[in-house]
Amino acid sequence: MIRRKKDKFSLLLTEIAKNIDETAEYFVNFKVTNQTTLKEFADTLKEYETKGDNHVHVMIKELNKAFITPIEREDILQLTNSLDDVLDGIEHFSAMMEIFSITSSDEHIDKFSGYIRECAKEILITIELLAENRLKDIQPHAIKIKEYEHSCDNLHRKSLKNLFGNETDPIKVIQYREIYETLEEIADSCQSVANNLETIIMKNA
């Protein structure tokens, strides 16, 4: 971050970002076809989320022990929490799919997933740049994250319009509305990561 040598906070943030990247990769590529694969999908994403929670616990412990941090303690914590929100959102999506017994995707879910996958790639790049103290190089990637989030906003409106205009089963309307909103919230969490990174740039560049 501010120092040339990677400190323990940079290393922990990188581990968190790598876990998000791996989670998003699995999230996009795993194909749910029946109840068995749906359970496997939800269970695996829960494992990724638990791994992320463990990273957060270590980060908080290290922050509490540290006398000096490379950037403001509160900024590290906010960034950590926003990263964790991305993982929590993905796990929540899989839990909703399992609760609703939805064993197939649709074009809107696929598009949301693609944007979230791209956000995860950009998040990993930004955290690695932060760890290398290349603050000025972060901005273009933060902008990309915000662009993907904006695309998800538009997709959210489009998906709801299609849902309310074409679905006649009221139960499915309720279920898919919650699914789409959960996906849009994941994108919002990605944008929060970008916002926190921009705050760090502003304070330290």
From Swiss-Prot:
Phenotype reported upon loss of the gene: Non-essential, it can be disrupted.
InterPro entries per the UniProt record, alphabetical: PhoU-like_sf (IPR038078), Put_Phosphate_transp_reg (IPR018445), UPF0111_domain (IPR052912)
Database matches in Pfam families: PhoU_div (PF01865)
Organism domain of life: Bacteria
Family: Belongs to the UPF0111 family.
PANTHER family: UPF0111 PROTEIN YKAA
Protein name: UPF0111 protein YkaA
Gene that encodes it: ykaA
